[in-house]
């Protein structure tokens, strides 16, 4: 598992990617609208009045083609007493659902980043306490390294003892055969 700083960097990269994907989705899927209450010809609202990209023009043409079909279906639904409530178009509901899901993903990722930041050392710890902790860890590491060197020496001694015992057994076997 990666250390906390690497995890934090990965989460930040993922958050940036999610922001980018969300903005791209809104940019390509949302209906153009005025940004503020200024005049329609103001600079801030010119984007809403700009010609539509080809993909959005195709979508609007498809909608217009589907409208006559929906008008045929609506009288049938109006005769049904259960369908008295007016529901928003399916595309609007779908767009809103996707936006809610994307927002939830962004919120969860930002909470994950906050938890990683909170788990980082140094917050609420003075530099002296950090140095003391580093010194303690360094002392523990030196003790473990000395123990490791001692165990290596012990292993080498045991190997030498085993080798000498094997030589004695081999010599004993050869002497009995001669």
Swiss-Prot record:
Gene3D superfamilies, sorted: Mediator complex, subunit Med21
**Physiological role:** Component of the Mediator complex, a coactivator involved in the regulated transcription of nearly all RNA polymerase II-dependent genes. Mediator functions as a bridge to convey information from gene-specific regulatory proteins to the basal RNA polymerase II transcription machinery. Mediator is recruited to promoters by direct interactions with regulatory proteins and serves as a scaffold for the assembly of a functional preinitiation complex with RNA polymerase II and the general transcription factors.
Compartment(s) of residence:
Nucleus
Drop me one GO molecular function for this one. transcription coregulator activity
Q: Which GO terms describe its biological process?
A: regulation of transcription by RNA polymerase II
Task: Read off the InterPro entries from this record.
Answer: Med7/Med21-like, Mediator_Med21
Main subcellular location: nucleus
- Give positions of region: Disordered: 36-91
Species for this entry: Candida albicans (strain SC5314 / ATCC MYA-2876)
Gene for this protein?
Answer: SRB7
Assembly behavior? Component of the Mediator complex.
Protein name per Swiss-Prot or TrEMBL: Mediator of RNA polymerase II transcription subunit 21
């Amino acid at each position: 598992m990666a250390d906390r700083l690497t995890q934090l960097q990965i989460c930040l990269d993922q958050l940036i990617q999610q922001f980018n994907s969300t903005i791209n989705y809104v940019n390509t899927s949302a209906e153009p609208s005025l940004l503020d209450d200024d005049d329609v010809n103001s600079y801030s609202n010119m984007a809403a009045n700009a010609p539509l990209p080809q993909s959005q023009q195709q979508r609007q043409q498809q909608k217009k083609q589907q409208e006559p079909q929906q008008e045929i279906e609506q009288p049938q639904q109006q005769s049904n007493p259960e369908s008295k409530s007016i529901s928003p178009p399916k595309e609007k509901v779908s767009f809103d659902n996707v936006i809610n899901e994307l927002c939830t993903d962004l919120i969860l990722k930002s909470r994950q980043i906050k938890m990683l930041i909170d788990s980082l050392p140094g917050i609420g710890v003075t530099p002296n306490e950090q140095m003391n902790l580093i010194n303690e860890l360094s002392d523990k590491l030196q003790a473990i390294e000395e123990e490791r060197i001692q165990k290596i020496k012990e292993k080498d001694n045991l190997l030498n003892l085993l080798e000498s015992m094997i030589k004695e057994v081999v010599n004993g076997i050869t002497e009995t055969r001669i």
